[in-house]
């Protein structure tokens, strides 16, 4: 299920650089992580939903690219973000 507008605003307020920030890597990674977690739960119940699985893999790849960019340009922000999101890196 897609993220509601309220949930997106809450995530952006917590992880964005300012309240209306939607473009920073932190905000984008946080939104992708939330969508990835929702889709992972969906796929636990619907194992043969290959169309959604492909979308999940695309989102994971996009998040990996954003994290790689952040790690290359600002390691402190990268480390802070992965610890706040609970990612395993």
Swiss-Prot record:
* Assigned GO CC terms: cytosolic small ribosomal subunit
Source organism superkingdom = Bacteria
A Pfam family (short name) is: Ribosomal_S15
Q: Which GO terms describe its molecular function?
A: rRNA binding; structural constituent of ribosome
| Keywords noted in UniProt | Ribonucleoprotein, Ribosomal protein, RNA-binding, rRNA-binding
State the PROSITE patterns in the record: RIBOSOMAL_S15 (PS00362)
Biological processes annotated in GO: translation
Tell me the InterPro entries matching this sequence: Ribosomal_uS15, Ribosomal_uS15_bac-type, uS15_NS1_RNA-bd_sf
- Describe its partners and assembly state: Part of the 30S ribosomal subunit. Forms a bridge to the 50S subunit in the 70S ribosome, contacting the 23S rRNA.
Name the PANTHER family on file.
RIBOSOMAL PROTEIN S15, BACTERIAL AND ORGANELLAR, SMALL RIBOSOMAL SUBUNIT PROTEIN US15M
- Alphabetical list of HAMAP family matching this protein: Ribosomal_uS15_B
Q: Which NCBIfam families match?
A: S15_bact
Report the function annotation for this chain. One of the primary rRNA binding proteins, it binds directly to 16S rRNA where it helps nucleate assembly of the platform of the 30S subunit by binding and bridging several RNA helices of the 16S rRNA. Forms an intersubunit bridge (bridge B4) with the 23S rRNA of the 50S subunit in the ribosome.
Q: Which family does it belong to?
A: Belongs to the universal ribosomal protein uS15 family.
Under what name is this protein listed? Small ribosomal subunit protein uS15
What is the organism field in this record?
Corynebacterium aurimucosum (strain ATCC 700975 / DSM 44827 / CIP 107346 / CN-1)
Name the encoding gene, please: rpsO
């Amino acid at each position: 299920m897609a993220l509601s507008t309220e949930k997106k605003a809450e995530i952006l307020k917590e992880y964005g650089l300012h309240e209306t920030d939607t473009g920073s890597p932190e905000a984008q990674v946080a939104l992708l992580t939330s969508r990835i977690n929702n889709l992972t739960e969906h796929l636990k119940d619907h194992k043969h939903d290959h169309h959604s699985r492909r979308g999940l893999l695309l989102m994971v790849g996009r998040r990996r690219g954003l994290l790689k960019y952040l790690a290359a340009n600002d390691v402190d922000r990268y480390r802070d973000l992965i610890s706040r999101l609970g990612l395993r890196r």
